Amino acid sequence: MSEVPDSYDPDEAEQKWRDEWLESDVYSYDGDEERPDYIIDTPPPYPTGNLHIGNALGWCYMDYAARYHRLQGDDVLFPQGWDCHGLPTEVKVEENRDIHRTDVSREQFREWCVEHTDEQIAAMKETMRTLGFSQDWDHEFRTMDDSYWQETQRSFLQMADSDYVYQDEHPVNWCPRCETAIADAEVENEDREGTLYYITFSGADNDDIEIATTRPELLPACVAIAVDPDDDRFEGRVGDRFEVPIFGQEVELIADDDVDGDFGTGAVMICTFGDKQDVDWWAEHDLDLRPVVTEDGHLNERAGEFEGRSIDEAKDEIATALSKSGHLHKEEPTEQSVGCCWRCDTPIEILSKEQWFVKVDQEEILETAQDIAWYPDHMYERLEEWTEGMEWDWVISRQRVFATPIPAWECADCGHIELADESEVPVDPTNDEPAVGSCPECGSDDWVGETDVMDTWMDSSISPLYVAGWPDETFEPVQLREQGHDIIRTWAFYTILRTAAVTDEIPWEEALINGMVFGDDGNKMSKSRGNFVQPEEVVEEHSADAFRQAMALGGQPGSDIQFQWKEVTSASRFQTKLWNITKFASEHIDESTPDIEAPAYRDADEWILARCARVADEVADDMDEYRFDSALRTVREFVWHDLADDYLELIKGRLYEGRPGERKAAEHALFVSLSASLRMLSPFAPFITEEAWSHLPADGSVHNAAWPDPPAGDEAAEERGELIAEVAATIRGWKSDEGKPLNADLERVEVYIDEDRPLDTYDLADTVNGPVYIEEGTPSVELVPVGVDIEHSELGPVFRDKAGEVVGRLESADPAELQAELDTDGHVEFEVDGETVTVEPEMFDIVEEQRAESGEEVVVLEADDATVLVFE
């Protein structure tokens, strides 16, 4: 055992143990068939280079679970993946190099994206190590590596073989800024201020009609006008034809139950496409397709003189033209929900494009999800709500570069689509030829490789398969997925869909969901509000362990939590307390302490060990259910109050002056309870617990130790020890309140309990600094009047010049007689200078003292299960 420094230096300790853990493979997954697996499907984060506090919360939760399960003897696989592909990296590379991706070859652009991603990953890995996360870095993976997108392509091919994947032309969400299709889950609706335009359509052979729209720029794409069939304003007009102003095409008035008659004029134009409702009407009524918006968000040749205008430019110019032509009746402000790209916040368009899709089997997804244990369980309802609201299949093709290639070729002569064979993957169709050679339909060997790539969620949605060794290993559900509630509709949804489609299994046994992290002021974190906190900032000012504890105590998993600096400060104070306990313990235990045989425990020892065993069970129950906040509070309460405040105070006398057997018993119980505490705390505060553990007679790392299993002890002895601790704490509290030194001597202490039972007063007497006697029953104590306390502000103004004499008469009177007169008459009367004066009760108080049956003055204290008489 090495000497424990007087104070704990987190900077030094954290750097030391980060290096030691990495060098010693403390967190390696062994693949031990004798132990149960605990595999975590870690979310591969997008490598932004910045592990923000929201990311850190999720990784804290995963790390708490990983460390706890190692203590439980499980073979833990805590991998680290990186979700590398995607538009943000492409945009950043374009900005950094001042290029457009089409300015260079696909290979060169991808190479630059990889270089940028590597730099970002390195920065995030350093933050993860700083925070003490215990990943097995031998199981790190990157979705941009060939070995990963090989399996992404393999799963794509297997799903295509099972008819989950298909190619078709269909209206899709399209981001004109990103110039790619995006899935429903990547569209976020925002409430924005817009304008409602009232536009007149001239009747072909009938009266005009007025429609209301927020998108006059889509007039060249108008294919019909729709009204509610029950709207009397349009009775007899269904089937009439009208000319679209400025652009001239004729459209028909149709009836549909989905038209909202209360919106605008009750008549709406149907365009291809303004929104999903337009798509539904277009399909249901077999309308023409008149696309007018280009992939980059401009109008095409159908817009005539407005061709080439951006959407916003076209809106303004067409509205102006309508006003000049007399077709624009009025404009009014309106609130509208606008679907926007979640990456760049650009309003999406709906374009009809040939794309690759994955079928969404809502029933299969929900049935699979029901077999997963959700923490908290109401998070399943979020998945259910999203799934039931799905209207379209998942469009998985993207018109980008930095992503997993879709393994397909098109025959240049006959249009046949050829998918790669599983033996070919990984494959890049823009560089590689299909193994089939000639086209099986026409015999041509002229192939055009698919340039579209896969949605990045196609990568990350196979993460549980990849970490579990699929396809080399038969897939079995991993134990845990931890993720934020904001990506239930994406990562959770897609993973359940894909795993069920490929393996007919659930992806994970348990799904643990975390919420968002708000600032100390309760608002969403932002630099403009001044409440933004980076994890590194907390570590630098306090420590990684303090940050980790604050994350655990912020709230229950699933709920949004508030980052609070006071929790960080409290954690730092607790760590100081823990270090002081370790320092004290190290002065009394040695290498032989753990091996003491049959220690002669006293009641206090039995009590602390029983409490420790109970706490270990409670904390384990909480950890099993991912109640990290409750688990940490329970163990901190035990360490601070039971172990430090109560037990250490009780045994100090034995440790310093006790006989060898008594001292050894206290040393052993102290070692057992402290070493157990360090193990229970280690998932939350890995650095200080490892440093403290290294100063105890314990083997290896605390993180590879076993979950504590202290002897439960004798129940009766535990109850006696509990009472001893209560009495000691009660007397200690009284001394503190009275400003007395805690080591102040007492003449004696009498403890009255309900039943006659032996109580070990050895430690208690040492602690309270006086002999302790145990009595059965209720003490005989009475309040005895011993004096008066004059209320001069009440008495003086009434008696004025006689006040002094009245005070003298009160102070010289027998307090007991004064009390009796008050009880009888409600006041006191005196003769002063031949005059009777009446002294009201508010003019003085009777001072009473507690007296024991012996007549001695005594202090009466109430403990939970005893009445304590203190004789000074």
Curated annotation (Swiss-Prot):
GO terms for cellular component: cytosol. Pfam families: Anticodon_1, tRNA-synt_1. ATP binds at K527. GO terms for molecular function: aminoacyl-tRNA deacylase activity; ATP binding; valine-tRNA ligase activity. CDD domains: Anticodon_Ia_Val, ValRS_core. InterPro entries: aa-tRNA-synth_I_CS (IPR001412), aa-tRNA-synth_Ia (IPR002300), Anticodon_Ia_Val (IPR033705), M/V/L/I-tRNA-synth_anticd-bd (IPR013155), Rossmann-like_a/b/a_fold (IPR014729), tRNAsynth_Ia_anticodon-bd (IPR009080), Val/Leu/Ile-tRNA-synth_edit (IPR009008), Valine-tRNA_ligase_type_2 (IPR022874). A motif ('HIGH' region) lies at residues 45-55. It is found in: Cytoplasm. GO terms for biological process: valyl-tRNA aminoacylation. A motif ('KMSKS' region) lies at residues 524-528. Keywords: Aminoacyl-tRNA synthetase, ATP-binding, Cytoplasm, Ligase, Nucleotide-binding, Protein biosynthesis. Its EC number is 6.1.1.9. The keyword Ligase applies. Gene3D superfamilies: 3.30.720.200, HUPs, Isoleucyl-tRNA Synthetase, Domain 1, Valyl/Leucyl/Isoleucyl-tRNA synthetase, editing domain. It catalyses: tRNA(Val) + L-valine + ATP = L-valyl-tRNA(Val) + AMP + diphosphate. Belongs to the class-I aminoacyl-tRNA synthetase family. ValS type 2 subfamily. ValRS has two distinct active sites: one for aminoacylation and one for editing. The misactivated threonine is translocated from the active site to the editing site. Catalyzes the attachment of valine to tRNA(Val). As ValRS can inadvertently accommodate and process structurally similar amino acids such as threonine, to avoid such errors, it has a 'posttransfer' editing activity that hydrolyzes mischarged Thr-tRNA(Val) in a tRNA-dependent manner. This is Valine--tRNA ligase. It comes from Natronomonas pharaonis (strain ATCC 35678 / DSM 2160 / CIP 103997 / JCM 8858 / NBRC 14720 / NCIMB 2260 / Gabara) (Halobacterium pharaonis).
